[in-house]
């Protein structure tokens, strides 16, 4: 038993230059943990609350001094004296102290910082890597990455409707090889864009946002880049994309619109599903995220019934890493995968519960970054600890993204012959892929 003796939070900056919370936690036997909390740009309406100050004279209202104050006062008093290895007790203590269903009193950014710092301090104290401390001796599966190399929708200023276009090195034999394949394709894509006179500046997640006219052009460009890098589309590197459909849904008329490329065009759920199905039939796509609005549960049922056997269907805004929404989805036969974002739910314990529930129901789990990231690499350890098998952590540029890939390669080296990279077999619940 090792007691927490001190907790200290401060306001620091994330990868977008916006304030975020950093927490340091100390134990009586010399254990130390530090954690930084990420932040999302496009967020689901059911996510846990990210507490901001609202003072327009500081950081345009985005300061986090209130959250920092809650850590340094109420939360610190509650967790000091607890055993640092009692993760569930630490997390539940904070949840109970907050007392709201969405962590609206203290903020999920305050609570998550303490939750992650405690886990790191416990791992430090027992002398284990974080992934091994969290996952035990069976933590050995390295994830297949989703690399966001092209951006559209709300993440760009072009007329591409879908928000993210990703490559997945499904044919790699290791994380190290997957990272190399991704890097080579990223640079091939950059060269193609330059040759076309397009913009090659990168966005929040390290991907390009060139002036493309529509989704079709984005898919064609990725296939061309994969070939240019010397790989076979589909066999070596497959495609994935995030529709972010909630950005294009009108709840009143129950229709979708191609908001950026052709805002006057309206689609019923069936027509929208058919449009996406057309892309999946034409291109080597293995995963689609948020194809339907987060509140259109009937639409999700329609989409899953038609597409569930041919592609991974990931719920992000739909599930927000929350077991209540995930259980509803499982009961309704909605989606077949969940995106896992630590700050959507706000504690490590609840994150583990969501991953476990997904696995028990035969859903895959994709551990994910946020658009506002930091140098913190916890999600790399988390995805190995849980043997989740897939990670979404940005493109092949920006240190805040690369830090996670570098950590995965370190973990793979540490595991040696015990490590397992599943590649295409990460989609174990989709008949047409595995």
Swiss-Prot record:
Annotated residues for binding of Mg(2+): 242, 289, 316
Residues binding (2R)-2-phosphoglycerate, per UniProt: 163, 341, 370-371, 392
Cofactor note: Binds a second Mg(2+) ion via substrate during catalysis.
Main localization category: cytoplasm
Cofactor: Mg(2+)
One BP term from GO: glycolytic process
This protein's pathway: Carbohydrate degradation; glycolysis; pyruvate from D-glyceraldehyde 3-phosphate: step 4/5
Active site residues per record: 205 (proton donor), 341 (proton acceptor)
CC annotations in GO: cell surface; extracellular region; phosphopyruvate hydratase complex
Enzyme Commission number(s) of this protein: 4.2.1.11
Keyword Secreted on entry: yes
Pfam families: Enolase_C, Enolase_N
InterPro entries for the chain: Enolase, Enolase-like_C_sf, Enolase-like_N, Enolase_C, Enolase_CS, Enolase_N
GO MF term (any one): magnesium ion binding
Compartment(s) where it occurs, according to its Swiss-Prot or TrEMBL record: Cytoplasm; Secreted; Cell surface
Family: Belongs to the enolase family.
Biological function: Catalyzes the reversible conversion of 2-phosphoglycerate (2-PG) into phosphoenolpyruvate (PEP). It is essential for the degradation of carbohydrates via glycolysis.
Name the UniProt record assigns to this protein: Enolase
Organism of origin: Lacticaseibacillus paracasei (strain ATCC 334 / BCRC 17002 / CCUG 31169 / CIP 107868 / KCTC 3260 / NRRL B-441) (Lactobacillus paracasei)
Taxonomic path: Bacteria, Bacillati, Bacillota, Bacilli, Lactobacillales
């Amino acid at each position: 038993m090792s007691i927490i003796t001190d907790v200290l939070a401060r306001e620091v900056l994330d990868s977008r230059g916006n304030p975020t919370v950093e927490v340091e936690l100390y134990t009586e036997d010399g254990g130390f943990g530090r954690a930084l909390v990420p932040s999302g740009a496009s967020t689901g309406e059911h996510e846990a609350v990210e507490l901001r100050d609202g003072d327009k004279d500081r950081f345009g209202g985005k300061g986090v001094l209130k959250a920092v104050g809650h850590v340094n006062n109420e939360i610190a008093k509650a967790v000091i004296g607890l055993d640092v290895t009692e993760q569930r007790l630490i997390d539940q203590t904070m949840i109970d102290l907050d007392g709201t269903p969405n962590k609206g009193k203290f903020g999920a950014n305050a609570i998550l910082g303490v939750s992650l710092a405690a886990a790191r301090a416990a791992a430090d104290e027992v002398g284990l890597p974080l992934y091994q401390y969290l996952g035990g001796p069976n933590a050995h599966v390295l994830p297949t990455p989703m690399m966001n190399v092209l951006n559209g929708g709300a993440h760009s200023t072009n007329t591409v409707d879908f928000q993210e276009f990703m490559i997945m090195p499904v044919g790699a034999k290791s994380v190290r090889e997957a990272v190399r394949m991704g890097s080579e394709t990223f640079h091939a894509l950059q060269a193609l864009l330059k040759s076309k006179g397009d913009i090659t500046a990168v966005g929040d997640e390290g991907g390009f946002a060139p002036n493309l006219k529509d989704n079709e052009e984005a898919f064609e460009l990725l296939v061309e880049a994969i070939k240019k890098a010397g790989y076979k589309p589909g066999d070596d590197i497959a495609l994935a994309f995030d529709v972010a459909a909630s950005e294009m849904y009108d709840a009143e008329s129950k229709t979708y619109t191609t908001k950026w490329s052709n805002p006057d065009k309206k689609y019923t759920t069936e027509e929208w599903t058919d449009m996406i199905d057309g892309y999946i039939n034409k291109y080597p796509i293995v995963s689609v995220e948020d194809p339907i609005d987060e509140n259109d549960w009937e639409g999700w049922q329609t989409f899953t019934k038609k597409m569930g056997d041919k592609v991974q269907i990931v719920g992000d805004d739909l599930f927000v890493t929350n077991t209540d929404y995930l259980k509803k989805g499982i009961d309704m036969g909605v989606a077949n995968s969940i995106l896992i974002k630590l700050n959507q739910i706000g504690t490590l314990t609840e994150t583990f519960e969501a991953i476990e529930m997904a696995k028990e129901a035969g859903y895959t789990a994709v551990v994910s970054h946020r658009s506002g990231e930091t140098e913190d690499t916890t999600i790399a350890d988390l995805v190995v600890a849980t043997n989740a098998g897939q990670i979404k952590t940005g493109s092949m540029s920006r240190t805040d993204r690369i830090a996670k890939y570098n950590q995965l390669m370190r973990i793979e080296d540490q595991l040696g012959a015990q490590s397992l990279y599943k590649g295409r077999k990460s989609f174990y619940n989709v008949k047409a892929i595995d």
